[in-house]
Amino acid sequence: MNSSARTRRDLPESPYLAAVNGRKPHRVPVWFMRQAGRSLPEYRALRAQHDMLSACFDAELVCEITLQPVRRHDVDAAILFSDIVVPLLGAGIDLDIVAGVGPVIASPVRTAADVAAMKPLERQRVQPIADAVRLLVSALGEVPLIGFAGAPFTLASYLIEGGPSRHHARTKAMMLADPESWHTLMEKLTDITVGFLRVQLDAGVDAVQVFDSWAGALSLANYRSYVQPHSARVFAALADYGVPMTHFGVGTAELLGAMSAALKPAPATVVGVDWRTALADAATRVMPGTALQGNLDPVVLLAGWPVVETAARAVVDDGRRAVDAGAAGHVFNLGHGVLPETDPGVLTELVSLVHSL
């Protein structure tokens, strides 16, 4: 076992860690993807003084932003504030995060020569992330900290497309037309993802979540052939840390079984489910012993409290049916990230409701 796993915090009262490890929590655990973000006025006040990338590389800012939703909402887990492209910066990729657009890659990776020129992650480039984790482990008390990284496929899409994409056409075309370069690229990105998560795990995160945001653009056959082996290597490389690992993508109903299989080496496995798939149905698609996370539609939070309450109760009930159907546990979350226009008061009330059920 990795030496850091032996010194990790012992959090026996954590509902989140109980649920993902297959134990019965004393309350339904809840946290939100993108809980640290533009829905919070305190976050917007900080970001008015710092651009996104500067914020991601300032350990004290990362700590403060990560803590904000824990203080405000009483969520059962914190997730490290970062951006999916931070490890690419750690590997020397020239990029920027453009307001209203997202990550923009200065020189997209589209040829075998581009792939060959890619460099590995340099740990010293992402040292502020490790520093932030250490600050958070000290500040969070009994609340677990979830580490964060993008999966190789989603990172590949940003690199190939040059930024966010609706159809991922260049990505899929390269994957199919030049599989040798594709797999070489994915191997390099797998190493980058593993390295970035090792930095966080060595600093003390209690769990990790790997976001394959764009995997839903793929067929099951293409996912299995071109993506799953690389994602599986991420989780296998980190299994000796002994922490729970979550695998999440959007629009991945047909991929849930394969995404769950990729997690298999991990000691405790969780699959994130979006709002398109019932949790009880997802429980029949994933590997035995897998916990589920999700899956309230983020848009529901804009529809007024009566709608939110009804939908939240339905998700909790569905989570219980999922456990009855074989899921190891259920963590209440959204099916994707909190929308910027979400009223933070609704999120606070939602946490209180879920805890009461």
UniProtKB/Swiss-Prot annotation:
Q: In which pathway does it act?
A: Porphyrin-containing compound metabolism; protoporphyrin-IX biosynthesis; coproporphyrinogen-III from 5-aminolevulinate: step 4/4
Catalyzed reaction equations: uroporphyrinogen III + 4 H(+) = coproporphyrinogen III + 4 CO2
The residues forming a coiled coil are: none
Please state where this protein is localized: Cytoplasm
Keyword entries, A-Z? Cytoplasm, Decarboxylase, Lyase, Porphyrin biosynthesis
Please state the Enzyme Commission number of this protein. 4.1.1.37
- Assembly description: Homodimer.
Tell me the protein family, please. Answer: Belongs to the uroporphyrinogen decarboxylase family.
* Cited InterPro entries: UROD/MetE-like_sf (IPR038071), Uroporphyrinogen_deCO2ase_HemE (IPR006361), Uroporphyrinogen_deCOase (IPR000257)
Keyword Cytoplasm assigned: yes
Its GO biological process terms?
A: protoporphyrinogen IX biosynthetic process
Q: What class of enzyme is it?
A: lyase
Residues involved in substrate binding: 34-38, 83, 158, 213, 336
Q: What is this protein called?
A: Uroporphyrinogen decarboxylase
| One Pfam family cited in the UniProt record for this chain | URO-D
* UniProt superkingdom: Bacteria
Q: Where is this site: Transition state stabilizer?
A: 83
| GO function term, MF aspect, one | uroporphyrinogen decarboxylase activity
This protein's gene is called hemE
Family matches, as PROSITE patterns:
UROD_1, UROD_2
One cellular-component annotation, GO: cytosol
